[in-house]
Amino acid sequence: MDVASECNIKVICRVRPLNEAEERAGSKFILKFPTDDSISIAGKVFVFDKVLKPNVSQEYVYNVGAKPIVADVLSGCNGTIFAYGQTSSGKTHTMEGVLDKPSMHGIIPRIVQDIFNYIYGMDENLEFHIKISYYEIYLDKIRDLLDVTKTNLAVHEDKNRVPFVKGATERFVSSPEEVMEVIDEGKNNRHVAVTNMNEHSSRSHSVFLINVKQENVETQKKLSGKLYLVDLAGSEKVSKTGAEGAVLDEAKNINKSLSALGNVISALADGNKSHVPYRDSKLTRILQESLGGNARTTMVICCSPASYNESETKSTLLFGQRAKTIKNVVSVNEELTADEWKRRYEKEKERVTKLKATMAKLEAELQRWRTGQAVSVEEQVDLKEDVPAESPATSTTSLAGGLIASMNEGDRTQLEEERLKLYQQLDDKDDEINNQSQLIEKLKEQMMEQEDLIAQSRRDYENLQQDMSRIQADNESAKDEVKEVLQALEELAMNYDQKSQEVEDKNKENENLSEELNQKLSTLNSLQNELDQLKDSSMHHRKRVTDMMINLLKDLGDIGTIVGGNAAETKPTAGSGEKIEEEFTVARLYISKMKSEVKTLVSRNNQLENTQQDNFKKIETHEKDLSNCKLLIQQHEAKMASLQEAIKDSENKKRMLEDNVDSLNEEYAKLKAQEQMHLAALSEREKETSQASETREVLEKQMEMHREQHQKQLQSLRDEISEKQATVDNLKDDNQRLSLALEKLQADYDKLKQEEVEKAAKLADLSLQIDRREQAKQDLKGLEETVAKELQTLHNLRKLFVQDLQNKVKKSCSKTEEEDEDTGGNAAQKQKISFLENNLEQLTKVHKQLVRDNADLRCELPKLEKRLRATMERVKSLESALKDAKEGAMRDRKRYQHEVDRIKEAVRQKNLARRGHAAQIAKPIRPGQHQSVSPAQAAAIRGGGGLSQNGPMITSTPIRMAPESKA
């Protein structure tokens, strides 16, 4: 390929299958493939060099798109392969694939293996030097993936105005395994992120450069070829990817650089524009030779077939269609020998001599025209014959060499020195800029780390402040609680002191009353003794009265028999009337008292019975609702079963329709075969052409009608299935809602049952209280009977006293004064007894009240003591929690400081390790070398796998003292 040749950019369209997310979302496959090199979307057809369907293998993609470039690169030409498309369209899968599975390898690992296999089959007199570089364009900055300290590399141009990345790390390799190790190393340093459309979305454009230099050891002919393998980041629509924060900034830069790439391709495809905006982004600067320059370029446009991404897919196809019109001029990159330069110099010198002679003729002809002379056609200079045609192989470099050779030796030496000096100054300035940028990046990283540490410290400090404020608030609230508890305790103590004082006062009063009671009791005893004496005397009088009454009755009987009067029955009748009145009064008081208590108990019992009836009614209603809910659930389950059967019937119908479609397709195939047979016969019978075409149109219309009916039936079945599914979902929702209602009703039922149990317990307690009241009533009744008996005894004594006094009045009038004195003494004794009874009753009431107050205080005292203990425990727990929080904060602070120190030490050690790169030695490899030979023996292996008899050829191996390479 000594002569430059034009060629278009080769564009291959690859369509990936629908992914799981698109299938779940219901996206449809909208792309169609009319032929192997065309694709259509929404009725518009795009033609490319090759269209790859979703089911093609990685090996087929490589064989179609990348394998032909290997021979061109090893023949001294430049090559470029890059993937373009929206995010999640399969670009990284196409370029890299799955490195762990050989069957899923992408273009990069396969082309690396193929390059070495091609080298092993070439002439053994050829010696190769292979260098690789791997960098990414992240946030419009070139970042070295093999040395992450180089974060802002610059793009320069060499003497032939070819752009290159200055300062990028170059690794010399001699086997595919070494290349794969470098790829793994760079891939681990590449920026990736998670978006809504892709779990491993590339956030940068990666460029993998393979620089192959070869030299024929016999003819000293040197060729060089560069292979750019570019994995572009996908264009993103933020509304779909959900990018935010740093990911959003990355998306902006990605879309900006891809927009610049689109502008370059549009300008190159137009052909009329004089300016191509290569300098709008670093991506287009690096790909300048690949787009409209000296390179054989293959572009793989990756498309998504989903209807969800229809607009992005159209944009990608239009991009590929424009890129297909770009023409590159491919020429061999050859370093000429001295003889070749000399031959070209002589050729150019001869050409310049002819040009000078032609110029002299033209000047003479022009002079004649200016003087007004006419120049005949035969005498006019023919430029087509006289001007020698420029050789297509003549490059601007050779022309410049010829012009420099035409200068004198001094000017040429001075120009060469100035050029070298300028290049040296440019290199020094680039080194200085690179060092400054690296220093700036390091300082930025340190500042970012410090800012992160400060932000983390601020967040920790804010969290600690919040914890401290929360703990202080808890402490304040605890203090308030303690104060309230202490105040309550003080009030309780004061109340307790007051109650104690009151109890002491009451006890003193009780003691005083007890003393008074004792005195009253002693007085009562004395009175009782006197009463006993009176009883004895009354008994004595009673006997006497009895005797006298017997005698009197006898006398009265005798008198009654004689007279027949009722005077003797008057007093007993009056006495019995007084007794009945007193007993009625006592019974009436007791009955009125018990009546009020019984009324209250009856009303309380009625309320409880009403509440119980209401509860029973609620339970019955809830049981009815529960049974209704169970019935509804059974009905819905039956409906669900019927709907499932309907769905199964729909599926069967769908299968039957699919079988019908298959049968129709078979009939269509048969009809098509018959049609072909008819077409074969048409060549012999031209008269039947119209009839056959009409038959064909009728058949096509019938097939179209069948297809439309089938589509309608399928659509109706899908709609019916979706409706059934919606109905099933609604029934499931209703079932779940009814289940929740059932659970709620069951909970309410359990709650009512619990309330019923509690009320039954309360009713039992009330019944027990009623029984106790009945028992107390019986006891009180017995007491009343005893009191009634005592009153009856006193009444009898009073009657006896009255009778005795009457008898004494009758017997002796002389003893009237004495009887009057006795009657006055008895009245005084009765008054004294009633006074003592009243005092005793008051003392009993006071004693009972004191006992009740003491019992209430004793009941309140344990509650207050329990509350005091709970408050003290709460205070102790808050104090321990505060202490634990302080200790935890101290531990977290120490651990955080230790972690920061450890990270700083690790970063420092890592920086030291990065600075300690050892010197690299380029390892030339020879064709015929076996793949399994170790790199240490690679320099001495020749064709056939045998070792060279002259030992390893180290003379051609350049020694590099640093990992960077300069242009």
UniProtKB/Swiss-Prot annotation:
Please tell me where ATP binds in this chain: 85-92
Single GO biological process annotation from the record: microtubule-based movement
Q: Where is this chain primarily localised?
A: cytoplasm
Disulfide cross-links: none
- Which InterPro entries does the annotation name? Kinesin-like_fam, Kinesin_motor_CS, Kinesin_motor_dom, Kinesin_motor_dom_sf, P-loop_NTPase
Q: Which UniProt keywords apply?
A: ATP-binding, Cell projection, Coiled coil, Cytoplasm, Cytoskeleton, Microtubule, Motor protein, Nucleotide-binding
Write down the PROSITE patterns for this protein, in alphabetical order. Answer: KINESIN_MOTOR_1, KINESIN_MOTOR_2
Enumerate the GO terms in the molecular function aspect: ATP binding; microtubule binding; microtubule motor activity
Protein name, please?
Kinesin heavy chain
Species assigned in the record = Doryteuthis pealeii (Longfin inshore squid)
Say which family it is in: Belongs to the TRAFAC class myosin-kinesin ATPase superfamily. Kinesin family. Kinesin subfamily.
**Region labeled Disordered — which residues?**
387-411, 923-967
Residues forming the Kinesin motor domain are 8-326
What SMART domains has UniProt attached to this entry? KISc
